[in-house]
């Protein structure tokens, strides 16, 4: 029996708002002492009333537009009722039947080919508190930190259009890239700002028979998503072949063991007893609202990747490296400033030397200390023959440390190459006179000897000889007949 794997994803992403979803508490809780970013609304105290965060709504709509969703003019919030220690009110304010965004799609690349996954909905809700599990003196405790409670959260639900663990990983990476480009989420999985539950099932390749799905939780990295889905794919297929009965369930991924385990029976919408949130008004969105939000959107990653290849003549891999992050793509375009002839050199410098500097210092391109105009200046100094490529690479670190323009550093440190032919010709003649053996070797056919002679010329000028000019003058002198 031949199987086809069917995968759908439910992705949660925290929004980068200053305040929480329904109150004025700071949403930036990272590193804060437990239970310090809280108020009566966060804690679900009786009598407290929520107020909608307008910016969170705008960010959700922007995400929906980027994913090609339809934005209904009317939306509302609902109460999702369930009891859990991380939910102080006993319900979560979410959206049920009238979400902000519906019927979209995301295109991404798999082995260089476009794949399209439909987006069922994007809705807005509040995050829950965080549970911290500890064991002290043999006793187990679960502590509750309410700082995360009420942070704006979007849930992006796909249709079951994915068919392999690798596709699921690539989709998630592309989705996170879009969210980061929009500036609506950090997308940092290690901080819980980008989380995913994966639904996976099996069906026959002809679609005539399909088995119940399993929802996998505890996926805290892209690698975990791919590994967990690969394990569950094999587990389900093996169970079917053995004639076992599969049930719809929620399973947890155990990273250290590389397996999924049963947690509970899968919930259904009726289990949550959704009903409209009575303390919040509905949301009405006009065409003017959508036009304003659309006007604030940047060019999206896939479109920019394609444009870089067409406009700047870059290869797919170069364009992918440059467009992986919006800040890097912006830096590249600011450096090139419309001059296509600089594109290749700028791409090489950014993906080579500048990326190496960023890795060394553990920072992003906006913190590395080099401005786009400074990198362009460095490239132009090399192209004009003012400095060598080696000197330019050394200067890049100095620019990063001091913020000083390359032209100023070249002047201050006397790094300009000697390109004057009269001056170089005199030194060439002296070097040839002082090294008759190397000259004889070259004239006997040992052309590698010119490297030694070039080194002597460079040494005489403290490494500032223009290598191209010096080599040409050496070759001309060596080809002269012996007197």
Swiss-Prot record:
EC annotation from Swiss-Prot or TrEMBL: 6.3.5.-
Entry annotated with the keyword NAD: no
Reactions it catalyzes: L-glutamyl-tRNA(Gln) + L-glutamine + ATP + H2O = L-glutaminyl-tRNA(Gln) + L-glutamate + ADP + phosphate + H(+); L-aspartyl-tRNA(Asn) + L-glutamine + ATP + H2O = L-asparaginyl-tRNA(Asn) + L-glutamate + ADP + phosphate + 2 H(+)
An annotated GO BP: translation
Listed Pfam families: GatB_N, GatB_Yqey
Highest taxon, organism lineage: Bacteria
Keywords noted in UniProt: ATP-binding, Ligase, Nucleotide-binding, Protein biosynthesis
InterPro entries: Asn/Gln-tRNA_amidoTrfase_suB/E, Asn/Gln-tRNA_Trfase_suB/E_cat, Asn/Gln_amidotransferase, Asn/Gln_tRNA_amidoTrase-B-like, GatB, GatB_C_1, GatB_Yqey_C_2, Gln-tRNA_amidoTrfase_suB_CS
An MF annotation (GO) of this entry: asparaginyl-tRNA synthase (glutamine-hydrolyzing) activity
Subunit structure: Heterotrimer of A, B and C subunits.
Chain's role: Allows the formation of correctly charged Asn-tRNA(Asn) or Gln-tRNA(Gln) through the transamidation of misacylated Asp-tRNA(Asn) or Glu-tRNA(Gln) in organisms which lack either or both of asparaginyl-tRNA or glutaminyl-tRNA synthetases. The reaction takes place in the presence of glutamine and ATP through an activated phospho-Asp-tRNA(Asn) or phospho-Glu-tRNA(Gln).
Sequence similarity: Belongs to the GatB/GatE family. GatB subfamily.
Protein name: Aspartyl/glutamyl-tRNA(Asn/Gln) amidotransferase subunit B
């Amino acid at each position: 029996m031949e199987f086809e794997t069917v995968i759908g994803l439910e992705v949660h992403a925290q929004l980068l708002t200053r305040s929480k979803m329904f109150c004025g508490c700071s949403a930036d809780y990272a590193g804060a002492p437990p239970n310090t970013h809280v108020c009566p609304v966060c804690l679900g105290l009786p009598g407290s009333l929520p107020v909608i965060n307008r910016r969170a709504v705008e960010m959700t709509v922007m995400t929906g537009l980027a994913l090609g969703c339809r934005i209904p003019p009317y939306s509302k919030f609902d109460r999702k009722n369930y009891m859990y220690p991380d939910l102080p009110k006993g319900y979560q304010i979410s959206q049920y039947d009238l979400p902000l965004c519906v019927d979209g799609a995301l295109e991404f690349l798999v082995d260089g080919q476009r794949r399209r996954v439909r987006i069922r909905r994007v809705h807005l809700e509040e995050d829950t508190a965080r549970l911290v599990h500890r064991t002290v003196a043999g006793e187990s405790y679960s502590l509750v930190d309410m700082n995360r409670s009420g942070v704006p959260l979007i849930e992006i639900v796909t249709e079951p259009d994915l068919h392999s663990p690798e596709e699921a990983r690539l989709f998630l990476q592309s989705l996170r890239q879009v969210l980061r480009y929009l500036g609506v989420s950090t997308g940092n999985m290690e901080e819980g700002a980008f989380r995913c539950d994966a639904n996976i099932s099996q069906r026959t390749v002809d679609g005539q028979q399909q088995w119940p799905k399993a929802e996998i939780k505890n996926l805290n990295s892209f690698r975990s998503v791919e590994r967990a889905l690969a394990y569950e794919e094999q587990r389900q297929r093996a169970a079917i072949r053995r004639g076992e009965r599969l049930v719809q369930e929620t399973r947890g991924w155990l990273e250290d063991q590389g397996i999924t385990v049963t947690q509970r029976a899968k919930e259904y919408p009726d289990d949550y007893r959704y009903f409209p949130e009575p303390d919040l008004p509905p949301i009405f969105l006009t065409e003017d609202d959508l036009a304003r939000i659309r006007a604030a959107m940047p060019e999206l990653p896939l479109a920019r990747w394609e444009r870089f290849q067409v406009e700047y003549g870059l290869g797919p891999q170069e364009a992918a490296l440059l467009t992986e992050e919006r800040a890097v793509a912006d830096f590249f375009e600011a450096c090139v400033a419309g001059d296509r002839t600089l594109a290749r050199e700028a791409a090489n410098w950014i993906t080579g030397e500048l990326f190496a500097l960023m890795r060394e210092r553990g920072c992003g391109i906006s913190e590395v200390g080099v401005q786009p105009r400074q990198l362009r200046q460095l490239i132009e100094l090399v192209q004009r023959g003012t400095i060598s490529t080696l000197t330019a690479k050394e200067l890049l670190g100095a620019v990063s440390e001091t913020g000083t323009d390359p032209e100023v550093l070249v002047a201050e440190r006397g790094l300009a190459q000697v390109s004057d032919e009269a001056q170089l010709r005199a030194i060439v003649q002296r070097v040839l006179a002082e090294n008759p053996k190397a000259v004889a070797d070259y004239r006997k056919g040992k052309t590698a000897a010119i490297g030694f002679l070039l080194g002597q010329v460079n040494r005489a000028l403290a490494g500032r000889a223009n290598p191209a000019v010096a080599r040409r003058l050496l070759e001309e002198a060596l080809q002269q007949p012996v007197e």
